[in-house]
């Protein structure tokens, strides 16, 4: 009740934040005359001065006014661009570790130079994260002259970069790259066999461009580095031939399924399920084709792999459509990013789904993959000491940014007022009527000389609109995943008078549409242009620019609403940049996916009750509210999926941190002899305890089994029964000591043969190899556990608690296996002299060969049904409270006698610190 009154008196939190920063802007402006008076050399010298002052104890906050004033002056001199006051506010927001929402055309790239320069003064490095390689290279090349003028180095990380170039890029003061490349390099670093092979330094400060795209849209899909597993391409081909014989279960008028058909599709959760009739039918088909034994069930334990293949093929045929979720290019399936409309080369679906799509399209089937390392963007970016982001649309997701990442959103005022007109949605009964209205609108705008941007949700839609325009004789350009190489050229002229551009999801394109076209692109197309030519091109552009402004600016037409309001807002934001005129209009129909799947029947019945005729549209607040409600419903569902993914990955993340810390400790250690000694004693103790239980009677001892186990684990044959027969004083403890002496003596014989230095190097490399192999298998086990854990809900158990409990048990077994397998390998190894450097070089060559075969994937996100199954009764009404997870600061070293952070109640040295 008091909230509106308090807001009126004190302003909103956003207004107070902006007001507070406006005072700092005044201080920066006051320094401007002083900076203008400096020579270039004096301005450059400021960087060294700031670095010295920082080293002596001044904070970055204290340096901020002067540093920002220096960057502003350098921008004027080097690039002819002066930071506006609102851009200074944006820079301060980023430095504070918050998200700056800035409208399209407000100069986000230039804003980033302020906090990037300031934080680079610490010498710890700054990462600037973009959504694609083109933008990473473009922004780095654009801003490089400014940074280098001020004495800072700039690097760019790209896929397939030579290791020495990538290492140099990470060593630079400022490093540009994509979220994928930064994430995969983090995983690669934790697979390295030498400290010299690692790329990244401490993760200090990251500025994420299009932060909503990276931290929200991409958060549902984990980053995975995988290697090849067994080949089962023939099975995919055989099962693929059977799937078309299955029929979808149809719905009656009331919406209830009939008995006819073999499977049902839930379009909301994108899941497909075989019904009872379908199970029987597919089992019969498999039996007839010799893939399933006579009378066997598809659900028998030994047939689960076959069941996985069946469901992968069924999903490939029913949920994945050519030119919507993927395109075929050559003999490859290229996935399409649902949020940006771009293809994702090298990205593959997991769990056999990609192979099933290849079989469906008749392409060569690539080998299946096994996870070698994985993480999520959520957990990767929380490793940075400080995280900030920029985007044109973050306010609709402010709740999620705060809940998941602990990041506040600050809406930065625009430099000029927004002059764009956003017209009401027009809703038609059918898609045919909707598209006819779109063509009419295009013709009217083109007659006025206005440029038009038509936004579609898929390649299929964009090509359909293109076909209609061709039939109407309207010249146009198409920008989608098939023609992305022409992107820069198409966008450059999308603002020319009367031009028509069709584009799939424009989110994350990162290029402004300039009214009248882009004169710089025209100049760049000329070889050695003269001053006269440049002046003529600029003059012609100025005429076109003015012509478009007078006609009303860019008109954005959207052919349907997206699942996210944010992507709709991004599309709208393409018009009306920097105070330019413009307009936007959404055309919808009841046959659109969003309306069909999520909008209520009440809306459909309401429209039909109005007696709408063919070609008529409706503009009504109730319809608009229903659409927004449907979008909020989808956004809420997707938020729940991302939250569930994070909660499950947090369990794996704690284990990941322990394993990666263990790896780094091993890589840094010159001698792992003490670690091997501890492993040997613990493994021996466990082996003896199995056959001679502590404080047991001699009659309970299994001496024969112990002798066999010692040979299996330690490669020594010991006559233990003979020792006991010959020595009556040989009790349990003295026997343990004697066995250990014999095992150690046998191992030292190998050391004498190989040499201490060579054996120490071999121990280190072998321990790393065993750790990596077992971690890889552990990841696979954890995947299987996660995919099936939702079924525990049917047994009235909490799936998340069960997952935590079982994953902890699995992790304890992993640590025991690392010790046991390392000792077993070292004990059985046949000694031959090999130079340690040669051994390391050989391992590095093997790692490089592995890297060539690696695949970098985004696995499919878990379905909503899996994520929340079995937990409905436990969830309170309203949004579940989430503890804010802030970006991880520098982690303090855990004392060996302190409680383990995993929550087991044990001391760290007896739990996850056993291998430190």
UniProtKB/Swiss-Prot annotation:
ATP binds at residues 87, 105-109, 512. Zn(2+) binds at residues 900, 902, 911-912. Its cofactor is Zn(2+). Signal peptide: none annotated. Residues 857-916 are annotated as: Disordered. It is found in: Cell inner membrane; Cytoplasm. Residues 906-916 have a biased composition (Basic residues). It catalyses: ATP + H2O + cellular proteinSide 1 = ADP + phosphate + cellular proteinSide 2. GO terms for cellular component: cell envelope Sec protein transport complex; cytosol; plasma membrane. It is an enzyme of class 7 (translocase). One of its GO terms (molecular function) is metal ion binding. It is a peripheral membrane protein. Its EC number is 7.4.2.8. Its main location: membrane. Keywords: ATP-binding, Cell inner membrane, Cell membrane, Cytoplasm, Membrane, Metal-binding, Nucleotide-binding, Protein transport, Translocase, Translocation, Transport, Zinc. May bind 1 zinc ion per subunit. GO terms for biological process: intracellular protein transmembrane transport; protein import; protein targeting; protein transport by the Sec complex. InterPro entries: Helicase_ATP-bd, Helicase_C-like, P-loop_NTPase, SEC_C_motif, SecA, SecA_CS, SecA_DEAD, SecA_motor_DEAD. NCBIfam families: PRK12904.1, secA. Belongs to the SecA family. Part of the Sec protein translocase complex. Interacts with the SecYEG preprotein conducting channel. Has a central role in coupling the hydrolysis of ATP to the transfer of proteins into and across the cell membrane, serving both as a receptor for the preprotein-SecB complex and as an ATP-driven molecular motor driving the stepwise translocation of polypeptide chains across the membrane. Monomer and homodimer. Part of the essential Sec protein translocation apparatus which comprises SecA, SecYEG and auxiliary proteins SecDF-YajC and YidC. HAMAP family: SecA (MF_01382). This is Protein translocase subunit SecA. It comes from Pseudomonas aeruginosa (strain UCBPP-PA14).
């Amino acid at each position: 009740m008091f909230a509106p009154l308090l807001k009126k008196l004190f302003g909103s939190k956003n207004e107070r934040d902006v007001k507070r920063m406006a005072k700092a802007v005044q201080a920066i402006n006051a320094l401007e005359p002083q900076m203008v008076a400096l020579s270039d050399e004096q301005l450059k010298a400021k960087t060294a001065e700031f670095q010295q002052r920082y080293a002596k104890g001044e904070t970055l906050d204290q340096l901020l006014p002067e540093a920002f004033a220096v960057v502003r002056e350098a921008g004027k001199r080097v690039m002819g661009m002066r930071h506006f006051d609102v851009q200074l506010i944006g820079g301060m927001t980023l430095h504070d570790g918050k998200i700056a929402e800035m409208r399209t055309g407000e100069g986000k790239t230039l804003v980033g130079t302020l906090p990037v320069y300031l934080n680079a003064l610490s010498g710890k490095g700054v990462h600037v994260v973009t959504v694609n390689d083109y933008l990473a290279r473009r922004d780095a090349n654009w801003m490089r002259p400014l940074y280098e003028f001020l004495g800072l180095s700039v690097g760019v990380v790209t896929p397939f970069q030579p290791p020495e170039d990538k290492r140099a890029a990470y060593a630079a003061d400022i490093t540009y790259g994509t979220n994928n490349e930064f994430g995969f390099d983090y995983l690669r670093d934790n697979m390295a066999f030498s400290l010299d092979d690692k790329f990244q330094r401490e993760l200090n400060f990251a500025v994420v461009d299009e932060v909503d795209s990276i931290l929200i849209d991409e958060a549902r899909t984990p980053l995975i580095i995988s290697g090849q597993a067994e080949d089962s391409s023939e099975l995919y081909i055989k099962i693929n031939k059977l799937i078309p014989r299955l029929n979808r279960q149809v719905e009656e008028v009331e919406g209830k399924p009939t008995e006819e058909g073999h499977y049902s599709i839930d379009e909301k959760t994108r899941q497909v399920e075989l019904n009872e009739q379908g199970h029987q039918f597919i089992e019969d088909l498999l039996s007839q084709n010799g893939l399933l034994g006579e009378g066997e069930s598809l659900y028998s334990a030994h047939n689960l792999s076959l069941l996985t293949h069946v469901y992968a093929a069924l999903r490939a045929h029913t949920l994945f459509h050519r030119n919507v979720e993927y395109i075929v290019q050559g003999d490859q399936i290229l996935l399409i990013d649902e949020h940006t409309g771009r293809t994702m080369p090298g990205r593959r679906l997991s769990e056999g789904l990609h192979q099933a799509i290849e079989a469906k399209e008749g392409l060569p089937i690539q080998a299946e993959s096994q996870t070698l390392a994985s993480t999520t963007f959520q957990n990767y970016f929380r490793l940075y000491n400080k995280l900030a982001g920029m985007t044109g649309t973050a306010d609709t997701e402010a709740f999620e940014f705060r809940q998941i990442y602990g990041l506040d959103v600050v809406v930065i005022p625009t430099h000029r007022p927004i002059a764009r007109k956003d017209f009401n949605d027009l809703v038609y009964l059918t898609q045919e009527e909707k598209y006819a209205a779109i063509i009419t609108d295009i013709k009217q705008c083109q007659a006025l000389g206005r440029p038009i941007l038509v936004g579609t949700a898929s390649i299929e839609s964009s090509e359909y609109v293109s076909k209609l325009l061709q039939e109407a004789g309207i010249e146009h350009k198409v920008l989608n995943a098939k023609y992305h190489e022409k992107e820069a050229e198409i966008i450059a002229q999308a603002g020319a008078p009367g031009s028509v551009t069709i584009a799939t999801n424009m989110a994350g394109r990162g290029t402004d549409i300039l009214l009248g076209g882009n004169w710089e692109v025209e100049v760049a197309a000329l070889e050695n242009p003269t001053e006269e030519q440049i002046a003529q091109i600029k003059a012609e552009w100025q005429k076109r620019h003015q012509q478009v402004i007078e006609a009303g600016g860019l008109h954005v037409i959207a052919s349907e609403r997206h699942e996210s309001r944010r992507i709709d807002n991004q599309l709208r934001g393409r018009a009306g940049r920097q105070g330019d005129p413009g307009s936007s209009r959404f055309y919808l129909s009841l046959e659109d996916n969003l309306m069909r799947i999520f909008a209520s029947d009440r809306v459909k019945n309401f429209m039909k009750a109005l007696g709408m005729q063919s070609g008529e549209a409706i503009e009504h607040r109730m319809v608009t509210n229903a659409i927004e409600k449907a979008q909020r419903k989808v956004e809420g569902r997707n938020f729940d999926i991302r939250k569930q993914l994070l909660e499950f990955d947090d369990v794996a993340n704690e284990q990941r941190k322990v394993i990666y810390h263990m790896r780094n400790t091993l890589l840094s250690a010159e001698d792992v002899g003490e670690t091997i000694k501890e492993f040997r004693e613990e493994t021996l103790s466990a082996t003896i305890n199995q056959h001679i239980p502590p404080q047991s009677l001699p009659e309970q001892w299994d001496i024969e089994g112990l002798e066999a186990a010692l040979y299996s684990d330690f490669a020594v044959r010991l006559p233990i029964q003979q020792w006991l027969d010959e020595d009556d004083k040989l009790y349990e403890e003295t026997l343990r000591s004697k066995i250990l002496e014999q095992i150690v003596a046998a191992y030292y014989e190998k050391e004498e043969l190989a040499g201490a230095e060579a054996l120490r190097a071999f121990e280190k490399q072998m321990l790393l190899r065993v750790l990596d192999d077992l971690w890889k298998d552990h990841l696979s086990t954890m995947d299987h556990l996660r995919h099936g854990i939702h079924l525990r809900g049917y047994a009235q158990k909490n799936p998340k608690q069960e997952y935590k409990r079982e994953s902890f048990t699995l992790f304890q077994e992993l640590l025991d296996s690392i010790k046991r397998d390392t000792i077993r390998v070292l004990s059985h190894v046949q000694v031959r002299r090999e130079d340690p450097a040669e051994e390391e070089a050989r391992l590095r060559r093997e790692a490089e060969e592995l890297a060539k075969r690696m695949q970098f994937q985004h696995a499919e996100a878990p379905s909503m049904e899996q994520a929340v199954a079995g937990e409905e009764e436990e969830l309170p009404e309203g949004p579940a409270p989430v503890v804010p997870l802030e970006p991880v600061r520098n982690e303090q070293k855990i004392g060996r006698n302190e409680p383990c952070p995993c929550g087991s109640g044990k001391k760290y040295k007896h739990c996850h610190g056993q291998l430190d």
